Every structure is written in structure tokens, then in C-alpha cells.
Amino acid sequence: EWWKVGTMAARHWDALDALVRERDPYCRGAVILGLSQPVEQLIAGFAEARAPLVKGFMIGRTVWAGPSLAWLKGEIDDAGLQAQVAANFRRLIAGWRDSRPARATTAPEAAGALA
């Protein structure tokens, strides 16, 4: 099972991590919900979510709600909608990656560099 939780302070993530380890042996991890938060606010929330329990994020409205409203009002065309949704998603991916600890690479070129 997975816990789906909104953004919160690091101390709350740590408390949730301890609680899940103690009482929910079937939990595979937690994912952060977007809950229509602005992109920058959600990215700031990623930085707080450093507990090992946190595995990723599930977003929807954060990515498409604003651009969709602009499209429905006729303020942007189809291409503009697609571009804005894609840009929001790319910003969230970059924000997530920037908030995670650096991991060792296992890419073939990295392995060759060690030889």
C-alpha cells in the first residue's frame, strides 16, 4: 500500500516515516500529492520531504489546471496549452530531482571511466 500525502514540514515527514515503520509493515512508501498547489510551492515542499519513506509525487491539477483555464478562456491555443503543461511538468521533475540526494551513477560510460 502507498500513503498519499500533501506537502508538509520535514519534522512531520520524519514523524510519519517513524510511524509507518512502526505500525504499517505493508506500506511501500509515500507519494506527495499536488492538490492544485502552485508549482513553486510544491517544489519547496519536495525539499522538506527528505524522509526515506517519500518515493515520489502524484500531480495533476498543479500541471494542467492553470493552462487549461487559459485555454478554455481562449487566451492560449492548443500549442500554448501543450507547451505550458509540458513546462510545468518539466519544472516539477527538475524540482524533484534537485531535492533528492545525489546518487552514484551506474551508467556504462561511468563504469568505463573507473577502469
Predicted regions and their residues:
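Active-site loops and adjacent core secondary-structure elements that bind or stabilize anionic groups
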Residues: 107-115
